[in-house]
């Protein structure tokens, strides 16, 4: 495992260090710009060929499309574990099976699930897993990292100070120093370690159950309100604890502002750095209002949020 400043840096390291000139890569419409922009840059600078598995109006993908898009020169599948807009969780184990059957790697963006959804890299077949510390892992901003299967060789994205092998011309080959050029955020990493103690004491599965219950309570409360449109698949037994919605044709930023100013409720409006998913959902112009639920939220807070949505919609 190597530490980074966030999942964006981790994904840049993995994508830039594993995908070479002329390679083919498969990704999805579910991705955050932290996946999309590194891929687009390699398309322009290295001639990397890109294909994207489309998402439907619920934000769902058809796994047959991964099979369909595979080519002899496919180097990797790069995809999120959970959409940061819909909360839909992708079947990473299934995708890994498809990728590995064709000799391709699987790079996973676990920004939305690390700390809140149990993840077993070996059981799922993940080659590289990238995460951020400030979301479900409850750590400080400026922390993140990537977990790497032992036989995966990533070319360093940045080089420089390493504290060891100082007389060598090149970055040390050994992990994690290979990918950790420069001074690390030691204070942030210490905070992340303290947060992990809290998570491990409670248990990721228990956190997942608590957050899912709050998310489900909110969804059940708002889905029947006239004028409210909710995005994502809520029939799946496992999903991220977020609910994205719109109220009539109201601008999502205006709704979010009213929730904050009038009701004291913090939400995220707009595009969520997920342009392809918004196009799939048909919300490019309006954006969406995203409610995110923590195991520290209460049922009373959820009920207050439902009441606020109802009041704005009336």
Model-based region annotation:
Residues 1-314:
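Pyridoxal 5′-phosphate
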């Amino acid at each position: 495992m190597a530490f980074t400043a966030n999942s964006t840096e981790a994904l840049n390291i993995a994508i830039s260090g594993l995908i070479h000139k002329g390679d083919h890569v498969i990704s999805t419409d579910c991705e955050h710009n932290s996946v999309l922009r590194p891929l687009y840059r390699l398309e322009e600078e290295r001639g990397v060929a890109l294909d994207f598995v489309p998402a439907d109006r619920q934000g769902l993908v058809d796994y047959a499309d991964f099979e369909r898009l595979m080519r002899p020169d496919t180097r990797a599948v790069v995809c999120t574990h959970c959409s940061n807009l819909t909360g839909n969780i992708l079947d990473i184990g299934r995708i890994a099976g498809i990728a590995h059957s064709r000799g391709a790697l699987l790079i996973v963006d676990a920004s939305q699930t690390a700390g809140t959804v149990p993840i077993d890299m070996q059981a799922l077949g993940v080659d590289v897993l990238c995460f951020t510390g400030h979301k479900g892992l409850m750590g400080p901003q400026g922390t993140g990292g990537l977990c790497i299967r032992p036989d995966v060789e990533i070319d360093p994205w940045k080089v420089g100070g390493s504290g060891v092998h100082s007389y060598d011309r090149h970055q040390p080959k050994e992990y994690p120093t290979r990918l950790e050029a420069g001074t690390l955020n030691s204070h942030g990493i210490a905070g992340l370690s303290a947060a992990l103690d809290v998570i491990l004491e409670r248990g990721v599965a228990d956190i997942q159950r608590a957050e899912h219950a709050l998310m489900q309570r909110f969804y059940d409360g708002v889905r029947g309100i006239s004028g409210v449109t909710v995005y994502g698949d809520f029939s799946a037994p496992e999903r991220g604890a977020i609910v994205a919605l719109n109220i009539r044709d109201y601008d999502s930023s205006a709704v979010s502002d009213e929730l904050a100013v009038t009701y004291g409720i913090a939400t995220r409006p707009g595009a969520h750095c997920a342009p392809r998913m918004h196009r799939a959902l048909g919300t490019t112009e309006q954006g969406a209002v995203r409610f995110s639920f923590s195991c520290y939220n209460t049922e009373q807070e959820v009920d207050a949020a439902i009441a606020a949505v109802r009041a704005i919609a009336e």
